[in-house]
A protein has these predicted regions:
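Extracellular mucin-like PTS domains
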Residues: 32-46
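C-terminal motif of bacterial Sec signal peptides marking the signal peptidase cleavage site
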Residues: 19-22
């Protein structure tokens, strides 16, 4: 199994645990459940309908999975570029990053369902757009623009993941 396949399966397993915790069981949403020393409380956005919650949780599964793989491959590309300082000597790391950013953006875009609230959809579109812009900068070998564009991408990704956290279980001790 290649490195991307392993990472995807690991991310899917982690997201499945989160999804099961968020959607599973017949307990009330606000009821903390104790497993060993960990208490998990589901925190849901105020005023969201059940259909919106389910749609956003499903969307967030894809966001978490895609973002994890995207970050990993982008960071691998940047480490290699910083080491060799030349696109010609980078090997295939730039192509991996481009492919992962574009594929991740497309998978997230396709995961938006009609019940996803418009404010969440707007955040998704910003994340998808900044992912595609970052891929374009890498493909165009525009090193000077990478820092600015990657900061935008990071901000958009963090904003979307923070929104996802409003719909997913929150854990603590």
């Amino acid at each position: 199994v290649g490195r991307t396949a392993r990472a995807v399966w690991s991310a899917i397993a982690a997201v499945s645990v989160l999804f099961t915790a968020a959607c599973g069981g017949g307990d009330a949403v606000d009821t903390p459940t104790s497993v060993g020393d960990t208490v998990t409380t589901t925190v849901l956005r105020e005023g969201a309908s059940e259909a919106e919650k389910v749609a956003v949780i499903r969307l967030c599964q894809q966001v978490i999975t895609s973002a994890g793989v995207m970050v990993r491959d982008y960071n691998t590309f940047i480490k290699r570029l910083n080491k060799v300082q030349d696109y010609k000597a980078i090997g295939s790391e730039d192509q991996w990053a481009i492919e992962t950013l574009n594929t991740g953006a497309e998978l997230v875009r396709k995961a938006v369902a009609p019940d996803v609230p418009s404010d969440v959809d707007d955040e998704v579109q910003r994340f998808v757009t900044s992912s595609e812009r970052l891929a374009e900068q890498i493909q165009g070998k525009r090193r000077d623009a990478l820092n600015r564009v990657s900061k935008d991408w990071s901000k958009d990704r963090t904003t979307l993941l923070d929104t996802c956290s409003e719909y997913l279980p929150a854990g603590g001790n």
